[in-house]
Structure formats: C-alpha cells, structure tokens
Amino acid sequence: MRCMTDSAPAEILEPAAPPAPGAEQYPALDLANSAMALPGGHTLDLLATPADAGHWLTGHGLAPADAGLREVCAAQLRSLREQIRALIASRVDGHPAPASALAAVNEAMTKAPAAALLHWDATRGLHRASAHPTTQILEHALAALAADAAELLTGADAERLTACGSPPCTRYLLRHGRRQWCSVRCGDRARAARAYARRTGRDDA
C-alpha cells in the first residue's frame, strides 16, 4: 500500500510553542508532544492532516520534501504517537508499561529493515546502503521513531523525563535542574497561577 502521493507540499505552519526541552535531541519526544492542549480549551495537532504529518516528517529528516502522505499512513503516525505517549506516561508515573503500547512500538521497530546491505556499482565500488523505496518511507520513519523512543525510555535520560507542570499543558520534557515546564509560556502561566492562589488564599501547597 502506497503512503505517498505526488501532491505538492502545502505551506508549513509554525507550531504554537517551541520544542520542549529534550525534544530536539529525541524526535520521539517531539512526536509525543505533537498534539498539545492550549489555554481556553483549545488543542493543536501538528499531525492533523496528511500534509501536516508529511511536513512534520520532512522537518525531522524522515521523509523527502516532495512527497505527500496519505491519510491512512498519517493515521499510523498518529497511532504511534499515542503508543509512545502511553509509554512515556507510564515511565513518568511509575506504572507498568501498557502491553499494547510495547507491542506497537516493537512492531514499528521491526517492520522496516534496519540493516544497511552491501551493494556494488562502478562509481562507488563496494558500499553499504539501506533500502528505502518510496513505498517504505513511512515504515522507515516509524521504525526510526520507535527506536528513538526505546532509547529515550531506557537510556540515561529516562530519569529526567517529566510532564509539564503547568496545566492544561500535556507535553513531556527532559527536566533540567528544578525546571518542570516545557516552555517560558507555561512557566509564566504556572507562576501567575501560584501568585493568584496566594492572593486569594487558595494555595493548597
């Protein structure tokens, strides 16, 4: 099944917030944060449409800029996002990892061939290269993101994973020192909420 169309890419929209700390290092963390809750009950999904999903993949070096993404495959990317979020949430909350999320991430890691095979041609001679036909662009992207999530969740940075401490934000980040906000905006909102609670006597801390 082809995931790519021949349609031209649409205009890239700017995200509502800068990447959370750690998201530039771990694309899987940025994927987990690609759907976010905004003040006033609003939400933003950076993978809402096939064009949005294609732009996100292109921006992370996981798809060519001149390829479009079909909805069925954009849905697969959104599904992997939810499974990675479930694993991050279980890690942050200290709960057992959901079996369905483990299975989905493991399947994504093994769906595309990861080995760089040997090839020979007159120009380059003997060399290694990974198969990456157009029909497998999404599979390779999902495999890369799943492997990145596994590294994040089991590596040295796993202890620094935390949820943004400024409701209604639902993003995750890698904690630096005592900071537990994903952005300056969330930090300002949390400080303003604490100041308001102190003024009105509603501080439960």
Residues covered by each model-derived region:
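Short helix-coil boundary/hinge micro-motifs
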Residues: M1-A163, P167, Y172, R202-A205
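Short alpha-helical segments used as structural interaction elements across diverse proteins
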Residues: R78, E82, C186-R191
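Short metal-binding segments enriched for Cys and/or His
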Residues: R191-R202
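Cysteine-rich micro-motifs
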Residues: G177-D188
